[in-house]
Design a protein with these regions (language model features):
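Hydrophobic/aromatic-rich transmembrane helices and adjacent perimembrane loops
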Residues: 237-276
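Extracytoplasmic
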Residues: 314, 333-336
């Protein structure tokens, strides 16, 4: 029963992309971004509707494979040895090979190939390792599939960048009768273009939070662009939702969460930093107060000792040593 199997797999597969996304941002030092990116990406209206139970579609894994490929490319760039670079390149190729089985869009292969080569170049990996890694990547995704990537990308752009209705001419009895037919993609609800506010509303109901997360992500990208390069193909698809088809909203949603997560992490780290500084400042103040008190006590005892000594001599009393010396002198005088 394929329908029953698909229905039971949806709750598991639709949220599976959270794992590689969380690992990705944990490796680059922004774990909260991975957490919120996964949560908002899962429960965004645009993706939640397309991966609901009962709707058996390829969308349930269309986020998992791109994020997994991005994670493996990131690990290839961070690898310490040439052997690990090649292993992660093979892993990225195999993940996209499986993606072709799941969702036959060869353009993904070409896009991630360019990202892999550029990321390794930015990380200053040896040219030999880049060359071998690229070869293994192409070998794993299947060379014939890779060679058809440019044609797939061209067809994709033609489908999603036609904004005007096309016209067709029909010839009847040697006469030409013009007839206008609508663009087929405009008749599909998920391929329709929606306003920018509606795009954000299908991610989070609060548009202000959407804008904050969207701008925050680009702020994060300015500082950490090298480690975010493997996510560029997925981000490009997400940005298409503003101009082309609303089906790409599901690719944009995780980036809103990533931006909000980065701001949240900055806020939490800032609060802990202020608390730590406040505690350290109090410790310094306490030590200074204790030192002054100790110094005041020492000064007080010194004053008491001086005062007692002065009072002792003022009353005509001498210390025991002085009195004994005078007595000894008197005895010696008498005996003499």
């Amino acid at each position: 029963n394929y329908y029953l199997a698909g229905t039971l797999l949806i709750p598991v597969l639709a949220s599976l992309f959270i794992l590689p996304l969380g690992m990705y941002f944990f490796r680059i030092g922004v774990p909260v971004s991975g957490l919120l990116g996964g949560l908002i990406g899962t429960f965004a209206g645009g993706y939640y509707m397309r991966s609901s139970i009962g709707r058996i579609d390829t969308d349930m894994l269309n986020l998992f494979f791109p994020v997994l490929a991005g994670l493996l490319i990131l690990l290839a760039g961070k690898a310490k040895t040439e052997r690990n670079v090649l292993l992660y390149s093979v892993g990225a190729g195999l993940s996209l090979f499986l993606f072709q089985w799941w969702y036959a869009r060869v353009a993904f292969t070409l896009a991630y190939f360019m990202v892999l080569v550029f990321s390794l170049f930015v990380k200053k990996i040896r040219f030999r390792a880049i060359l071998v890694g690229a070869f293994l990547f192409v070998l794993c995704v299947e060379p014939a599939t890779f060679m058809s990537g440019s044609g797939s990308a061209e067809g994709f752009l033609k489908n999603y960048f036609v904004f005007e209705e096309t016209a067709s001419n029909t010839v009847i009895d040697d006469g030409t009768t013009p007839a206008t037919f609508p663009n087929v993609f405009k008749t599909i609800s998920e391929a329709d273009t929606v306003h920018m506010d509606e795009v954000f509303r299908r991610i989070l109901s609060n548009i202000t939070l959407d804008w904050v997360g969207f701008l925050a992500f680009f702020g994060l990208a300015v500082f950490r662009w090298r480690v975010l390069l493997p996510l560029v193909p997925m981000l490009a698809l997400g940005l298409l939702s503003f101009q082309s088809s609303n089906r790409f909203i599901m690719y944009l949603a995780p980036f809103i969460g990533i931006g909000l997560g980065w701001l949240l992490q900055l806020g939490v780290e800032g609060v802990f930093l202020l608390i730590t500084k406040n505690i350290d400042h109090r410790d310094v103040e306490d030590k200074e107060v204790k030192r002054k008190r100790l110094k005041a006590k020492d000064s007080l005892w010194a004053k008491i000792i001086v005062w007692l000594s002065m009072d002792f001599y003022a009353n005509g009393r001498a210390p025991k040593g002085t009195k004994n010396a005078k007595t000894n002198q008197q005895i010696a005088a008498k005996e003499g």
